[in-house]
Every structure is written in C-alpha cells, then in structure tokens.
Design a protein with these regions (language model features):
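ATP-binding N-terminal substructure of ATP-dependent carboxylate-amine bond-forming enzymes
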Residues: 1-79, 83, 98
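Anionic group-transfer/hydrolysis microenvironments
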Residues: 7, 45, 116, 151, ...
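Active-site flanking residues adjacent to catalytic metal/cofactor-binding acidic residues
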Residues: 42, 113, 149, 221, ...
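A short, flexible beta-alpha/helix-coil linker loop
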Residues: 68, 118-120, 238-242
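Active-site nucleotide/adenylate-binding loops and adjacent lid/helix of ATP-dependent enzymes
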Residues: 70-159, 163-182, 186-212
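Conserved metal-phosphate-binding beta-hairpin within the catalytic cores
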Residues: 214-242
C-alpha cells in the first residue's frame, strides 16, 4: 500500500511499500499520489473536503467525498439521518449566543453544545445544565459554529459496523456494546446485552444509512439504546474503533 500523510512519523509508514509526506492542501503532491495508486481511502474523517474532492477527480476514492462531507458536519449528519426516518436527538444549529439562547428554550436542559466540526472524545463540547449560562457554554467551545443536542438518557451505547461494496452488497457485523470512561472508549463487548429484535433493528438502521449514502467502504454507526428506542448518535466514515 501507499500512504499519504502530513506527519513524517506516521506509524503506517513502517508497513507501507511507499509513502508521501505532504500537507493535505499540497495538490501537486496529491496528484502525484493519485497517479501511483488504484484506489484511495482515508482512515479518519478530518481530511479536508476539498482534498477528497480533488482526489476524486484524479482517481477512485472510497468512501466518496459526498459521504465524507455529510459525516464531517454534525448538522448535515443529523439532518440526513432524520430525513431517513431514523431517530436522532433533538437538535438546532447555533451560530451565536442569541441562537444558543433560543435553542436552549426550545430543546431544554440538560443539553449538549458541540462544535459542528472536528470535535471527538468529548472535545469541542459543553454540557448545559440548569446553572449553565449560554454565554459560558458558547465561550467554552470557542464560539465556533455549533449544534445544540438534547441530552439523551440512555441504557446502553452500541455501535454497528457495516460495509458496502461497489455492487451495493451490504454486510453488517454483530453489534458491540460500548463503555466509555471520560469520553474515551474503553471496552467493546460482542454481542451487546440487547434483545435479538433490538440488534436486528440496529443492523437494519445501519443498512439504511450506508445504502442511502451510496457508501463504499466500512462505516461505524453509534447508537443509544433508550428503553425500546434506538437513537443514532453519529456516524464514522471509516473503520470504527469499536
């Protein structure tokens, strides 16, 4: 395999046949990379969208730049999933403190304010409880474009790992149950401690999402189990850490 990375000490270099060290905006290096490979994929979702779109013009890219764009923005992601008739937390776009005040009034407390892009493992977010001011929460996330999500009281957190091929064939793995400490995934247990019917519903939801995106590759879909309901938290356009 051939690796492209901006870091000179990427661990993948140790097992790759070749590698290029260059920035994601170095389009000459990207074009040279694209000419040397048959298919390009990415292993995390913070590759710039214009980088993915550029590669797509010069080689086969999977997953597509459109799928990446949807997964990179929490508003786009939630809107897309809700449009499929799949449950997500109540949400609202927040572009300023006044927006946040209005969103809190509509969605209520507790709720969670998250940056629209780049946050992970609890970073780039602020929990809003009764004593939290909108100004404090807005400052905590760096006053970046954001999403306010209603807080979900859940019984379990699960994920579904699904793969889809060029021909549209979908394979879905057994559902793991995930446990986090300080927002970091610590354990994934397979099978999850859920009913067979709930597991089948989760797998069906994952198949719906990956098919609707016309996705090619492996995807992780994180979900909350709350009573009899399954609520999608987010999608990861890559091999998921669970």
């Amino acid at each position: 395999c051939h690796i492209f990375a901006p870091e000179g000490d990427s661990p993948a270099f140790q097992v790759s046949a070749a590698h290029i060290v260059a920035g994601y905006q170095d389009f000459a290096a990207l074009e040279a990379f694209a000419k040397r490979v048959d298919v390009v994929t990415y292993e995390f979702e913070n590759v710039p969208g214009d980088t993915a779109a550029f590669l797509e013009k010069h080689c086969v890219l999977a997953p597509s730049s459109a799928a990446l764009k949807t997964a990179q923005d929490r508003i786009d992601e939630k809107t897309f999933i809700a449009g499929l008739g799949i449950l997500v937390a109540p949400f609202a776009a927040v572009n300023g403190e006044a927006d946040l005040e209005e969103a809190i009034a509509r969605i209520g407390r507790p709720s969670v304010l998250k940056t629209r892009r780049f946050g992970y493992d609890g970073k780039g977010q602020a929990k809003i409880v009764e004593e939290t001011s909108a100004a404090a929460a807005w400052a905590e996330i760096g006053k970046a474009p954001a999403i306010l999500e209603g807080f979900i009281s859940f019984d379990k957190e699960i994920s579904v790992i699904a793969a889809r091929g060029w021909d549209g064939t979908i394979a879905v793995y057994d559902v793991p149950e995930n446990h986090h400490e300080n927002h970091i995934l610590r354990t994934s247990t397979v099978p999850a401690g859920i009913s067979r019917a709930t597991a089948e519903e989760a797998r069906d939801m994952a198949s719906t999402i990956i098919g609707a995106l016309d996705y090619v590759g492996v995807m992780g879909i994180e979900m909350f189990v709350s009573g009899t309901r399954l609520i999608v938290n987010e999608i990861a356009p890559r091999v998921h850490n669970s």
